[in-house]
UniProtKB/Swiss-Prot annotation:
InterPro entries for the chain: Arc_rbn_hlx_hlx, CopG, Ribbon_hlx_hlx
Domain of life: Bacteria
Keywords annotated in UniProt: Toxin-antitoxin system
Composition skew (Basic and acidic residues), residue ranges: 64-76
A Pfam family the protein falls into: RHH_1
Function: Putative antitoxin component of a possible type II toxin-antitoxin (TA) system. The cognate toxin is VapC10.
GO biological process terms, semicolon-separated: regulation of DNA-templated transcription
Ranges where the record places region Disordered: 64-85
Gene Ontology terms: cellular component: plasma membrane
Protein name: Putative antitoxin VapB10
Amino acid sequence: MKRTNIYLDEEQTASLDKLAAQEGVSRAELIRLLLNRALTTAGDDLASDLQAINDSFGTLRHLDPPVRRSGGREQHLAQVWRATS
């Protein structure tokens, strides 16, 4: 184990101490537990984000799609196409 010093504000310290007391562990042990949880679940965010996207499909099916009209966007894209071709 390596020693690391960090600076915490008063609110963070109080919250950690309260949670540590509830869990029956020291502040240092709680910080280690929280770090381990954050580090081991870091990749899960992508999976949960993708699941949320998949779950959202079809939720707005009752809405009519917006009407697309020609306008500045098409002209801009045509200019970009000509400039890069």
